[in-house]
Swiss-Prot record:
One of its GO terms (cellular component) is cytoplasm. Peptide chain release factor 2 directs the termination of translation in response to the peptide chain termination codons UGA and UAA. The modification N5-methylglutamine is found at residue 251. Coiled coil: none annotated. It comes from Campylobacter hominis (strain ATCC BAA-381 / DSM 21671 / CCUG 45161 / LMG 19568 / NCTC 13146 / CH001A). This is Peptide chain release factor 2.
Length: 364
């Protein structure tokens, strides 16, 4: 890097900060923060626990946004001042140090941009994920299992926690179906872009002739909704079945019918839960998942109406990403149109860059 390149970088980063400022409007946020702090001083607020919690979440969200913005703004201003002073004093050592720190400065401002992309209505919520294999029997079930492992490894990398709601093992390999909650900061904001059809091309380990196979699996990501969000579900639209736990994920096999399967007849959405020994808790968890899925379905319907996007079956529906392991190794996201060569690392959970690239593409 030379002086010209660094000067251009500072200009570019200043433009990014200005764009973020135009989006978040710090003065308006500071005014709202002052209003919240005044409201918190009113004893009447704490009588309504739900409202108090809602106000508290809003305060935390605004405070975090303002803190990140101020930090990035200060870092950029400091870098600019140090650089101008170093140039005027012909201080090569300081200039070279600033050059070395430039990547970190760029990364911090990129993180600020990303946090703005994760400021949607439900982005701060936990994510409920369902993975279901497409046609192809063992091939599809194994691919669904590979995707589940990918998300588990991603969560381990970034510090998210997972709660399994329902886990149905495949007959020979992989999984028939899995529902789980990902808990952590902006879990839904990051993982919402994973909803869609994932396609795998590889030499099948289940084919003695060593032929190439294509497999599909669907991923549905929905936000874990707060209890105060009302989703109207008519009891007559539900079919509720109780059955014995199958020992999901190596857990206990229950001798009572504590596992719950709920079918929403109008949409044919089926949710299951068997993670608890208590039938009532499993039913409550299943209803939470159903509520989340119906909320997401309604949102998708509105998007499809505005985009006029037709919907198809799992094999040929809305593919979002291709994973090719043979004859070459490549993962390509069909929305950002970016190809990645580290297929094995990606399947081992290294997907943060892919998620961020899609989020950035969706904003452009």
């Amino acid at each position: 890097m030379d002086n010209y390149e660094y000067s251009e970088l500072l200009k570019e980063l200043k433009n990014k900060i200005s764009n973020v400022e135009a989006i978040i409007k710090p003065k308006i946020l500071m005014t709202r923060l002052a209003e919240i702090e005044k409201t918190e001083q009113d004893p009447a607020l704490w009588v309504d626990a739900k409202k108090a919690a809602q106000i508290g979440r809003e305060k935390t969200k605004i405070s975090n946004i303002l803190a990140k913005f101020k930090k990035a703004q200060n870092e950029l201003n400091d870098a600019k001042e140090f650089y101008e002073l170093a140039v005027s004093e012909n201080d090569g050592e300081t200039i070279n140090e600033l050059f070395r720190e430039s990547a970190k400065l760029s990364e911090n401002i990129a993180n600020l941009e990303l946090s703005m992309m994760l400021s949607g209505e439900n982005d701060d919520k936990n994510a409920i994920i369902n993975i279901h294999p497409g046609a192809g029997g063992t091939e599809g079930e194994d691919w669904a299992g590979m995707l589940y492992r990918m998300y588990v490894r991603f969560c381990e990398r970034v510090g998210y926690k997972i709660e399994i709601l329902d886990f149905q093992e495949g007959d020979e390999a992989g999984i028939k179906d899995v529902n789980f909650i990902v808990k952590g900061e902006n879990a839904y904001g990051y993982l919402k872009v994973e909803s869609g059809i994932h396609r795998l091309v590889r030499i099948s380990p289940f084919d003695s002739a060593g032929r190439r196979h294509t497999s599909f699996a669907s991923v549905v990501v929905s936000p874990e909704l707060d209890d105060d969000i009302q989703i109207n579900i008519d009891e007559k639209d539900l079919r509720i079945d109780y059955y014995r736990s199958s020992g999901a994920g190596g857990q206990h096999v229950n001798k009572t019918e504590s596992a719950v399967r709920i079918t929403h007849i109008p949409t044919n959405i089926v949710v299951q839960c068997q993670n608890d020994r208590d039938q009532h808790k499993n039913k409550a968890s299943a209803m939470k998942v159903l509520k989340s899925r119906l909320y997401e379905l309604e949102k998708l319907k509105k998007q499809e109406e505005s985009n006029k996007t037709p919907k198809s079956d799992i094999a040929w529906g809305y593919q979002i990403r291709n994973y090719v392991l043979f004859p070459y190794q490549q993962v390509k996201d069909l929305r950002s149109n970016i190809a990645y060569s580290q297929a094995e690392a990606i399947l081992d959970g290294d997907i943060k860059k892919i998620l961020e690239d899609v989020l950035i593409n969706n904003q452009s």
